[in-house]
Amino acid sequence: MTGLAIASDTLATLKVGSAFKVSHGHSKIFSPGEDHQFVVYHSGSSALNNVPIRLHVDAWFRTLTKPLTTIDAYVANYKKFCESTKAPQTKASERELLLALADDTVQICRENIDRVVGHIKDNLDNPENKKLWNEALIKEAKAAFDFYKELPRFDGFNETNTKDIITQLKVSVNSALRFYFREGYPARFASILAHAFVFRVASKVESSFDSYLTFSGFGTKEIYPASRRINLRGVIGGKLQSDPDNDVTIESEGKGLGIVYGAQFDAMYSVIQGYRKIVEHHVHNTITATMPELPEIQELANDVVKGMQTITAKDYVNPAFRRMANFSLSELAETTRDLVNLQILSAKLSGSSETVGGEIEYLTIDKVNGIRWQNRI
C-alpha cells in the first residue's frame, strides 16, 4: 500500500518585544476534515499578515467543498483564497507587514553601519567624523539598493506597481530611520534607502516574516502521495507573495521513496546523507582557498563534493531507503517520529537556542484509510 507518514514537534518561539520566549503545545499539522486526504504542516513565522497561520489555514479549510484532484490543485486553491475577500487579512494587516519590512530593512542597515563606523557615533560633533559617518551611510544605502535590485522578484511585482502599493498604504522608511539613526543622517541616504526598500518589498529575499506551508497527501486522481512546500510572505496590495520551494525532498534512486522536510533542512540532510551540509561547504572552500590560482580549482572542488555525495548515496542513503520501502505505514510513522526526536536531541546537545522540541504529533495517510493520527495533542 502506498502512503506517507508525517511528524512534527510542537514547540514555538514567540517574540516578546526584543526578546524570544519558547512555548510548548503548538500543533503545526492542520487537517481539513474526513472528506479530504491531505494535511498542511507549518514552519517559520506563526502569522501571515499578522493573522495566526492556524486561523488563516482553517478559514481556507471552511471554503473547501468536494475533494480536489491533486495536491497541486489544493495549493493553487489556497493561493487563490489568500487573494480573495474570504481571507482573514485586511488592508490594515497588509500595511503592518509593509511597516515590518521597512523596519527590518533599516535595522539591517543600522547593524551594518555599526560594524563599519559605530565607533564614531558618539563623537559626530567632530566635522571629520561627521563626514565619515555620512559617507558610510550613503555607501551602505547604495549597497542595499544594488543588492535588492538584482534579486528575483515575486510574480506580479515590479518597481512601478510596488512603489504604487507602498504609496497607497502610506508606508515609508522615515519613522524607522528616525528610530534607528537618532544621530542624524543625510537626505541622500534616506532617498536611496527608500528606493532600495521598493525593491526589498518586491524581491524574494527570505525574512523572519516568512511562513512555510507543506501540503501532503492525495488528491482524488493521485495514486501516489505528493508533497508541495510553498514559502509565503503574505498579501501586499491584494497580491500574494509566495514562491514554490522545490528543493525540499531527499530521494532514493528511482524516486520511489523520499523524505520531505518542512523545516530543519540541515539536520534532516545529515541524518540521511551522513554529514551536515556545512561539511560539503567546508571541503569546497578549503580546496578553493588552498590553490586559488589554479584555473580548474572550482571544477575540482565541485567534483570532490559530488564524489562525497555519490559515495554516501551508494553506501548509505540508498540502502537505507530500500529498507524503509519495506516498512508498514505504522513503522514509517514511528520512523518519522524518531527523526524528529533525533533533531530534538541534537538541539539540546548543541547548546544553541531551542528551536525544536515538545510533544511530537505524527500520522499516516493512505488511499484506503485516509488520515490516521498516531499521536495528536
Show which residues each predicted segment covers.
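N-terminal nucleophile
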Residues: 1-377
